């Protein structure tokens, strides 16, 4: 039994440095810093990125009251979280903060596949821009 716990702890420790381990932005200051970085707007969402010195991928989600009532905002954020979980391990880069902002109507009503494609194309565009600035 103790050996199983040790193995579980080792797996957990090794996954902390993985690219699939997404850290969530929670502090207002982190969101403000991300807003000063590069932005890409599309019909379904706004994506903001900014470099961080941590060497990890951090992601934040926000939806204003313009998106709808609490139920609609939470549904939009759930969809954005699902997209980030699927796309960032493959298309995100270590050392960047990402903020996904939901848009009125379209974040909730658009097909999931379309949302994901919009997010991936936004990431590719923003990473090309970030290379040009460096």
Predicted regions and their residues:
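Positively charged, solvent-exposed patches that mediate nucleic-acid binding
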Residues: 1-134
């Amino acid at each position: 039994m103790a050996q199983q716990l040790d193995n579980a702890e080792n797996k957990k420790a090794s996954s902390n440095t993985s690219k699939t381990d997404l850290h969530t932005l929670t502090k207002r200051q982190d969101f403000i810093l991300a807003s000063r970085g590069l932005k890409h707007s599309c019909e379904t969402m706004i994506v903001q990125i900014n470099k961080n010195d941590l060497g990890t991928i951090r992601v934040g989600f926000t939806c204003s009251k313009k998106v709808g009532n609490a139920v609609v905002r939470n549904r939009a954020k759930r969809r954005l979280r699902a997209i980030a979980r699927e796309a960032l391990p493959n298309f995100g880069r270590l050392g960047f903060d990402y903020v996904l902002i939901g848009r009125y109507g379209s974040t909730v009503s658009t097909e999931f596949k379309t949302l994901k494609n919009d997010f991936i194309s936004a990431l590719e565009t923003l990473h090309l821009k970030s290379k040009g600035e460096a």
